[in-house]
């Protein structure tokens, strides 16, 4: 009986003391019904008809109470019946969260689930209060000290309960003042410049919000400043963060101990160098001896040593820098203590997170081979190559040790896939073209194979166009790629009231082979065929020059052309989509070959570079330039449908698509004459045979978007410029009358530049890339077609 009393005291229960063991002819459970009653009966150590002792009763009370499902448990005897009475905790039937915006609802729900607050769990109010407290502490860590988190429990029938987490996030506290103490050599203003957080001032519309995480980053920036300017012993000894009574303002005091400013006297490398002393010693030349000590220089050498060792298989090498201070002379010597560790062999390459992309596709980008020495350079190169595919939002790599082996590892690449496909269906209406229907499907990672497949079509009152494309980047094991297109277009605007009406039927195909030279360079060659049939076109001056050179007769043109294309590509971008570092450049050309009706060639050059301004690559400068030149040969002119135009996203934002270039000059007929005179200057753009474009952009963090989501959106401030001209204008214009020339600009001048400035936004949306831009022309000419707001689906800047 003493044992029974102890159990009652331990578990906060009361129970009738039995005088002696008895046989329970029946067992009754009070306080619950249904499934829970049956579960209790099934868990009891005794059954009806069995003998019940003190220990049995104690075990019943103990086991039910420690299950955590009951607030109270009692057991007693009523005659020959064992009665078990319980007060059950409520079962969670629903969980709701209201008032949150800073913390996503999904993140809060995942945290609730992990802490035992999902539907069907037992409600433990103490744990619920602890959860609310932890959320409130998180809000305080991001500067929202007045945030409230109130857990509300609504009791429902049948022992159920509904949880509501009511949140009031309030606003962040402002940094009211910032004070430094102990800084005798470095001014407070210099230290303040190292910080992102700045005191609130009257001229700041929104003030500066205080956030604990950013404050910690700023403290590290101050430490780095001291360490990189000779103060090798500098320390932040104390920080004092004081809130006002309303918890709306923060006053911060930072105490520092600067110490002496040192020069770097000498540096040496010792330890287990893995037999690579000759390769490691030259790395010390990057240090500036007898100059101000900079910790970042030492860190660079440490990383260079580990990288060099990693290239020879020492993937777990450690480097520790030990300073030797000479305070009298204010100098220090650095000893780099190296432990190369064991030389590692790669057992397997493994991939995680690739639910769409096949392992075999990712393996095509690997340079590290299984069963060979680990090489950190090749492992990193694999990461870079995966990033360049454009299939992934993020790519990370790590080394996993093998149980039971101290010299084997697995190299693991963890990827987060992005949507590489886009689907676009649209219906539009134009005053000239009438109702138009557009549809396109593009998949850059078809069935996870890495192949690109696309089909696009347009149908309106003027005609129909279809284009099928396919590219296989892994056509051979050596990395040779194979691509091709099949296209058809039927265009008829002869019923239009404009001067540019004509009919055109075009179809053809092409195939291209790409050959890698090294990790950054490749070249390609290709063959193509195009058939063009053009009729019912109005007589225009530039078209007429082309027709005369081709010796066409009648109002119709039919051409069969075969062309050879060639080019070189360079790519050092760190990512295939939204790159932040590196250069991409290309030189290319296309020329018709024997058997073609036309004789012409086209040359192009493009280059784009990205240069990060900060460590996190959130601020990036981008510069882009392109040029194109085309001309006929063999006494034949460039076809008028192969000229260049500019305008729109991709060349010159702020101007209508294809609206920049030399204008058409149509023939006028008078006095019943069948021969026209080229006098009618039109706003229609006929294009030129030379083009140059340039763009400079400052890529900035997108407002109201978290850092981890910055790689799915991009915001930029830009300046665009472009010019399209006719290099043969000096001779071409000789066929025009003087009064016409007076009304025309000099189409041969490359200096007729248009320019615009504005803001752009790109989003990798679930339906594909969306591009928006708003631009204002800063250099334009009379009658230019300005289009300030533009957008595109499935494209990029």
Swiss-Prot record:
Keywords annotated in UniProt: Cell outer membrane, Membrane, Repeat, Signal, Transmembrane, Transmembrane beta strand
Pfam family, one: POTRA
Position of the signal peptide: 1-19
Start and end residues of each POTRA domain: 22-89, 90-170, 173-259, 262-341, 344-418
Gene Ontology cellular-component annotations: Bam protein complex
GO biological process: Gram-negative-bacterium-type cell outer membrane assembly; protein insertion into membrane
UniProt subcellular location: Cell outer membrane
PROSITE patterns in alphabetical order: POTRA
Major place of residence: membrane
InterPro entries: Bac_surfAg_D15 (IPR000184), BamA/TamA_POTRA (IPR010827), D15-like (IPR039910), OM_assembly_BamA (IPR023707), POTRA (IPR034746)
Record note on quaternary structure: Part of the Bam complex.
HAMAP family: OM_assembly_BamA (MF_01430)
Homology family: Belongs to the BamA family.
Known function: Part of the outer membrane protein assembly complex, which is involved in assembly and insertion of beta-barrel proteins into the outer membrane.
Protein's name in the database: Outer membrane protein assembly factor BamA
